[in-house]
Amino acid sequence: EKADWNDYGLVGISIIHSGQVIPGLTLARLLRKRFPHLHIVIGGSVFNRHADLLDNKQALFKDFFHSVIVSEGEKPLEELVNHLKTGQALATVPNLIYMDDEKVIHNTKAEALPYDQLVCPTFDQLPLEKYLMPYPVLPYMSSRGCYWGKCTFCTHSFIYDSYYRKENETRVAEEIDYLSKKYKTKYFTFSDEAISPNAFNRMSKEILKKGVEMRSLGMLKFESGDKESPELFEDVHRAGFLMLFFGLESANDRILSIIDKGCDQATEKSVLKNSSDAGIWNHLYLFFGFPTEEREEAEDTIRFTVENSETGTGHIHSVGQSIFALEKDSAIYHNPGKFKVDRIIHDPDRDMAIVFDFDIKAGMPREEVMDVYEHFDSVIEETFPSRKIWNYLSREHFLLYLDRFGKEEILNMAHSASVEP
C-alpha cells in the first residue's frame, strides 16, 4: 500500500552497514526532495562511527537529511518528535547532530535507558507474510553491548558507548512467549553481541520453566569449561537454541592473547565438544592476517578446524572465514604501533571509510594472507561435506532446516547425497 506522506512529519532511516549508505542516502534524498515538509533523521552504526567527520559535511544536512541520532536512539527519537511537534529548538534533544546557520551542532549525549524501561519489540507494520519464509524469524536482543568488550579488533560495542547491560531473564522468557503467540512463530534470532554464560544459564532455565516453545540461534564467546559446561549446553539446547555462533578468530594461543580473547585453544576445543555433544550446531567465525600473524600460526587455525570438522571430531559443523579488516575506532586503530602496524592508509577519496588498508612491520604480507585464505577455502570444501547446504543459506533459513530435519540428518544428507550448489 502506498503511504500518504502528508500524514507524517518525520522519517527515520537506519544505516547499519557500509553497503546501506548509498541506498539509504538515496532514499533520504528522494523523500526530502519530494516531500519537503518531512524531517529526515539518520540513525545506525555507520553515521554513529562517523560523527566526528560531520562538522564539515554541511552538504549532507542540506541535501540528504536534517539530523543524525548517535548511540542508542529510543529516548532521543522521542524527544525529537516532541520538539518537532511543539516547534521547540533542537538544542535540547540529546544525542542529536544537526545544522544551524551553516554550523553542525553536536548536542550533549544522554545516558542510555535502563533495560527495564525498554519496551518489547513490535513488528506490527512489517509485511511478515511477504518474506520468503514459511514462518517469520524475529530478531530479539536480551542485552546491549558486549559483556567482554576487550577484543582488540572489534567495534561492535561502539554504538553502545562500550556500556553493557542486559534484560532480566524472566522478562526475556515472557517477551519471547508473547512475541511467539502474537506473530504465530517459534523462530527467533538472538542478536546480542554475545550472551554471557551466566545470562544464558538463567535465560534457558526461565524459558524451560515457562514452557515457551522456541527455536533460535545465538552468539557466544569462548569461556572456561566450568562456565560453559556440558550441563549449560544441555539446558541451552532443551530451551530451543539449535545453533550457536562462536568467534574463534584464531586457534593459535599467541594470536588469541594479542587479540585479548580471554581464552586459549584448549578452551575452544572443550567448549565446542560440550556444545556439540548437547546436540547444538556450532558455527565458527575466524580470520587470517591479524597483524604479526605468521603462516605457521595461521596453520594452527587451519589444523584445528580440520581436526574438529565433520571428517574429524565432528564438533565444528560450519565455518565462515575472512581476511582481517582494520576498522575505525578499534583498539588497533587507536594504537597501531602496539600491534606492529607501520601505517594506516587514509584515502582522501574515501573520507567516510570504516575499513582501512595498512602496512605492517611483522607478520604475513597481504599476498600471503590471501594465499592462506584460498588454501583454507579448498580445505574446508573437503572436510565439511555439508557446506554444499549451509554455505548457500542465510542463517535464518538454515535455522528452519535445523528444526525441520535435525543436525544429524542434515549431516547425513550431505554425506549420502550429491548436493549441487
Regions found by a protein language model. Name each.
Residues 1-108, 326:
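Glycine-rich beta-alpha loop elements in corrinoid/cobalamin-binding modules
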Residues 54, 231-232, 292-307:
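Catalytic cores of alpha/beta
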Residues 99-139:
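N-terminal [4Fe-4S]-dependent radical SAM core
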Residues 47-52, 198, 254-259, 288-296, ...:
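Flexible glycine/acidic-rich beta-alpha junction loops that bind and position SAM and/or redox cofactors
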Residues 10, 37, 41, 173-282:
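Conserved SAM/AdoMet-binding glycine-rich loop
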